[in-house]
Swiss-Prot record:
Residues 30-59 are annotated as: NMP. Residues 126-132 are annotated as: LID. It is found in: Cytoplasm. It comes from Mycobacterium ulcerans (strain Agy99). GO terms for molecular function: adenylate kinase activity; ATP binding. This is Adenylate kinase. The keyword Kinase applies. It catalyses: AMP + ATP = 2 ADP. It is an enzyme of class 2 (transferase). Gene3D superfamilies: P-loop containing nucleotide triphosphate hydrolases.
Length: 181
């Protein structure tokens, strides 16, 4: 099963991705983790990504796409994967579609974890990070909405909405149900 997880910062995507990957016996692919591992290992892509990150810039899509494409070449992804944090734009979604087409497969499901803005504010402020001010959090939510609206349209028929308010186990049960598991 090949699954894309979408949701705003604080929706619990990373936690649910781990739980789903464990339950389904497939890897969780997080672009953040891919960047960290490639930087730590000193790969060519890692060195290039580090230049952007050190400058405080976003890593260009072509570089992110290459990292994901390389990860999809690993044997553990043959039975499927959970993508967490990718794609973030229609451009990346189209690149992913092409990567999977070359492997004669496609995305099986897109789960959108939905949480109210008030709940997200509380969750993110509760993390106690110094940079998580209301202004910064609200801006991150706006950026997410602006980026994700076109993505939801792109994946239209594959998107299943998951109510992400509740305990970890309640949200997990809803996610499994949305996947028909």
């Amino acid at each position: 099963m090949r699954v894309v997880l979408l949701g705003p910062p604080g929706a619990g995507k990373g936690t649910q991705a781990q739980k789903l990957a464990e339950k389904l016996g497939i890897p969780q692919i997080s672009t953040g983790e891919l960047f960290r591992k490639n930087i730590q290992d000193g790969t060519k892509l890692g060195v290039e990504a580090k230049r952007y990150l050190d400058a405080g810039d976003l890593v260009p899509s072509d570089l992110t796409n290459q990292l994901v494409d390389d990860r999809l070449d690993q044997p553990d992804t043959a039975a499927g994967f959970i993508l967490d944090g990718y794609p973030r734009s229609v451009e990346q979604a189209k690149a992913l579609h092409e990567m999977l087409r070359r492997r004669d497969t496609d995305i099986d499901a897109v789960l959108e974890f939905r949480v109210s803005q008030d709940e997200l504010l509380q969750r993110l402020k509760g993390r106690g990070r110094a940079d998580d001010t209301d202004e910064v959090i609200l801006n991150r939510m706006k950026v997410y909405r602006d980026e994700t609206a076109p993505l939801l349209e792109f994946y239209d028929t594959e998107v299943k909405t998951v109510d992400a308010i509740g305990t970890l186990d309640e949200v997990f049960a809803r996610a499994l149900q949305a996947l028909g598991k």
